[in-house]
A protein has these predicted regions:
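Nucleotide-activated chemistry modules centered on ATP-dependent adenylation/adenylyltransferase
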Residues: 1-109
Length: 109
């Protein structure tokens, strides 16, 4: 398996700007993704929020931590900004697709 990041530095925010400028890619029309502050990643994955929420339950870190860490390393956020975003969004329960996830798993809310 080959990943694009093997060949090109992967910086999500810069990739978003490139895609929106050159391909017409549009950010999430509903605003940010649940559990984080970004509005341009995992837009087509209804299970992603639950994956990250369970990571928060199990490990104490989730999507906002991952996103902020990448953006701090790439110079798009300061450490203090990242900490504030993580405190605000990590652990947020993903309600948007809860009915569909429950139906898929054969569960009730």
């Amino acid at each position: 398996m080959h990943w694009l990041s093997y060949y090109k530095k992967w910086v999500p925010q810069e990739n978003y700007y490139y895609a929106s400028e050159h391909t017409g890619f549009m950010a999430n029309p509903d605003g940010r993704s649940e559990g984080t502050y970004s509005k341009y990643a995992s837009l087509d994955d209804k299970t992603d929020g639950f994956h990250w929420y369970m990571a928060y339950v199990k490990f104490g870190v989730a999507r906002a931590t991952s996103d902020a860490s990448q953006e701090i390393r790439s110079g798009h956020l300061t450490r203090d900004e990242g900490i504030a975003l993580v405190k605000r969004y990590d652990g947020e329960f993903p309600r948007r697709y809860l009915p569909q996830i429950c139906e898929y798993l054969g569960m009730t809310e």
